[in-house]
């Protein structure tokens, strides 16, 4: 009988052995014969299933399967033009009852998405013993590879420190790594969730209120090594406690340690300190008297509770004193009741009982009666009851002084806690110090301790000012005074007093009219208001230059001169030659040169301190017709006549040590000709000094030339007639 099989099943099989325990799909017997059948050289075949979803009892050819999968793969990940929406995912059956998982798909913005929230993907694993590279291509087509190393490939990877952009760090093998792009491990500001660091994170000293502080700053703030020291007051930091003499006087910056609730808003510094100690829940504090040496969280929002070291609260253990924790910080804040080692006593075979009856020996306190099983003398031989007492005070008067607790020698006060940073003390001085154990490299940024003053509204800083030492080690140093408006984010104004003596201002003023100069000046000195009319000089700013041994010195001062009484002050630049260093005064008053800027006459004059005005700087008078009235013609003959009256003389100035003979006119004589030819000035001595008015003289000289010109023209005309 032929054994060529052509049943329903159908997957091509070059060699199949069918046993009683394994049958070809759809075949139970072959020509009615069961058992082992050798199908070598035979095959089974079946047409492709027509249904869209095939059942287990149906089969499919290899071509059918490939033709079915290919469109799905192409549509999911490799869709080509003209298709645009590439959002069909490549899915897989999920585990643990999840129907399906979106493993990978191409999104409309041309990125590859792995997993999805809707599919409950719990994570993506990348298995690599080497490195994973992220390849970026810029606009010019240049590719840059950014590797992500596994610890197996780079075991030192966990030792890499955090670093700022543009800096260079070294890994544990000494290799230099340049940081030139922002990332999670180079910009801590990008961390939006709670992160636990397993290695120390190096940061600079905090500057702003919300900056992370360094260990050095934390130690300094608590008064540790190198911390703040103050003369004239207790050098306790916030949270430190000590024993005050009496409740009759508790300083304003302290609170008693009575286990009371405090408002967090009223004691922000102490609450900040309490949080460093991990305060417990208030319910635990109240229910467990042995936890009352700790801070509690109060109501959890607005209050907190201080330790009850004075034993004031109901049920608290009283009369507490402190002791060290023996190196176990877990015991900190735990309260202990009175305790002492037990005292035992025994005296065998010294008490006699009758008939071995119990209770025949009287006992008191710590003494207990125990009946021995040993025989004693027979009855009637003179045995007696013996009673005994134990009284420790008979050996030392220490015993019995306290009825309920073991008490060492002590005195009683009241425990208090430093709650505020403010203080008041006479003759107080203090230091605010930042310190390093060793010299820092040249150029390292350094800051001294910060002294800060604030005005706070509703718990938020509004205005603040500070003074702080800052600079770069061995390069630059200054003391900075800062004033800032935090609420409205107005830029800080700072004054830097440099180590080389310079004073720098960092903030510019807005230009305004000169009439507003009293309120719009970088450096404004105190106003000098006299209670009565006064004459004298006030120097605003000045400084000396010269030789320290006494010669060639000059002190230059800008100030104001009031003279005479009841007159407007005049701006003056004063130069004091060869002044005395110890007193700052000029022993020879004549060697002083003053330049005056008159606010009334607009004149600039120069003279010495003896009252002599030597020069008056000329100025150009305004001659605009629009500023004049009553304009009339005036003959030039008067000008020529006046010039002819002037007596041209020689003279020597009184102050001129060289006695130089000069030529010119005498002001008093010109004043007699025409008062407009001279100007009068008051000296320091109150006398008038006359000076020639060059402007009037020049104009009259021009008029005289015009008069002479007319006379020449008349004479020329007469000569022409002859």
Swiss-Prot record:
Q: Which UniProt keywords apply?
A: Late protein, Viral tail fiber protein, Viral tail protein, Virion
Subcellular compartments: Virion
Give the signal peptide, or none: none
Q: Mind telling me which InterPro entries this protein's record contains? A: S74_ICA
Peptidase S74 domain: from which residue to which, for each copy?
Answer: 623-719
Gene Ontology CC terms, in alphabetical order = virus tail, fiber
Report whether Metal-binding shows up as a keyword of the record: no
Q: Which is an annotated Pfam family here?
A: Peptidase_S74
Function text: Probable tail fiber protein.
* Listed name of the protein: Probable tail fiber protein
């Amino acid at each position: 009988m032929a054994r060529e099989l052509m049943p329903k099943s159908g997957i091509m099989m070059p060699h199949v052995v069918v046993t009683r325990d394994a049958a070809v799909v759809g075949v139970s017997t072959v020509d009615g014969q069961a058992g082992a059948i050798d199908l070598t050289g035979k095959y089974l075949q079946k047409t492709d299933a027509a249904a869209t979803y095939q059942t287990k009892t149906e089969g499919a050819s290899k071509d059918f399967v490939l033709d079915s999968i290919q469109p799905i793969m192409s549509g999911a990940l490799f869709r080509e033009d003209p298709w645009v929406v590439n959002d069909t995912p490549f899915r897989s059956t999920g585990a643990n009852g999840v129907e399906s998982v979106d493993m990978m798909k191409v999104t409309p913005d041309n990125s590859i998405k792995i997993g999805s929230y809707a599919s409950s993907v719990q994570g993506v694993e990348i298995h690599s013993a080497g490195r994973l590279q992220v390849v970026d291509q810029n606009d010019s087509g240049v590719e840059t590879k950014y590797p992500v190393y596994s610890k197996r490939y780079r075991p030192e990877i966990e030792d890499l420190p955090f670093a700022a952009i543009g800096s260079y760090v070294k890994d544990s093998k000494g290799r230099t790594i340049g940081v030139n792009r922002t990332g999670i491990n180079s910009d801590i500001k990008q961390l939006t969730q709670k992160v636990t660091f397993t290695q120390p994170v190096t940061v600079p000293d905090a500057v702003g209120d919300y900056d992370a502080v360094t260990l050095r700053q934390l130690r300094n703030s608590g008064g540790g090594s190198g911390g703040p020291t103050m003369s004239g007051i207790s050098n306790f930091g916030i949270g430190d406690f000590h024993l005050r003499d009496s409740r009759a006087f508790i300083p304003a910056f302290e609170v008693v340690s009575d286990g009371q609730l405090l408002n967090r808003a009223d004691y922000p510094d102490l609450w900040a300190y309490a949080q460093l100690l991990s305060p417990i829940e208030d319910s635990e504090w109240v229910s467990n008297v042995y936890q009352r040496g700790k801070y509690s969280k109060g109501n959890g929002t607005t209050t907190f509770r201080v330790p009850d070291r004075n034993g004031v609260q109901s049920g608290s253990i009283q009369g507490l004193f402190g002791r060290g924790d023996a190196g176990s910080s877990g015991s900190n804040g735990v309260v202990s009741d009175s305790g002492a080692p037990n005292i035992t006593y025994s005296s065998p075979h010294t008490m006699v009982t009758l008939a071995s009856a119990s209770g025949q020996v009287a006992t008191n306190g710590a003494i207990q009666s125990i009946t021995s099983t040993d025989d004693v003398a027979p009855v009637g031989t003179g045995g007696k009851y013996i009673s005994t007492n134990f009284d420790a005070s008979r050996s030392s008067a220490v015993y019995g002084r306290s009825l309920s607790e073991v008490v060492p020698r002590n005195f009683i006060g009241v425990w208090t806690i430093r709650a505020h940073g403010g203080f008041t003390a006479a003759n107080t001085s203090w230091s605010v110090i930042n310190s390093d154990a060793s010299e820092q490299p040249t150029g390292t940024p350094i800051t001294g301790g910060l002294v800060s003053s604030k005005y706070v509204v509703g718990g938020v800083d509004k205005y603040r000012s500070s003074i702080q030492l800052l600079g770069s080690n061995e390069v630059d140093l200054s003391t900075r005074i800062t004033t800032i408006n935090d609420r409205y984010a107005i830029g800080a104004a700072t004054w830097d007093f440099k180590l080389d003596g310079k004073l720098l201002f960092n903030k510019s003023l807005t230009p305004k009219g000169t009439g507003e100069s009293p309120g719009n000046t970088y450096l404004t000195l105190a106003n000098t208001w006299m209670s009565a009319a006064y004459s004298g000089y006030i120097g605003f700013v000045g400084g000396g230059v010269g030789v320290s041994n006494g010669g060639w010195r000059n002190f230059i001062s800008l100030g104001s001169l009031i003279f005479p009484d009841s007159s407007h002050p005049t701006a003056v630049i004063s130069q004091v030659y060869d002044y005395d260093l110890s007193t700052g005064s000029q022993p020879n008053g004549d060697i002083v040169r003053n330049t005056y800027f008159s606010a009334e006459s607009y004149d600039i004059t120069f003279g010495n301190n003896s009252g002599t005005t030597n020069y008056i700087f000329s100025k150009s008078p305004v001659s605009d017709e629009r500023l004049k009235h009553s304009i009339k013609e005036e003959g030039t003959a008067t000008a020529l006549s006046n010039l002819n009256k002037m007596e041209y003389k020689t003279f020597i100035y009184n102050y001129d040590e060289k006695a130089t003979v000069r030529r010119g006119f005498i002001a008093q004589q010109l004043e007699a000709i025409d008062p407009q030819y001279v100007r009068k000035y008051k000296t320091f001595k109150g006398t008038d000094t006359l000076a020639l008015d060059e402007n009037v003289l020049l104009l009259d000289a021009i008029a005289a030339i015009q008069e002479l010109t007319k006379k020449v023209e008349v004479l020329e005309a007469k000569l022409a007639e002859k």
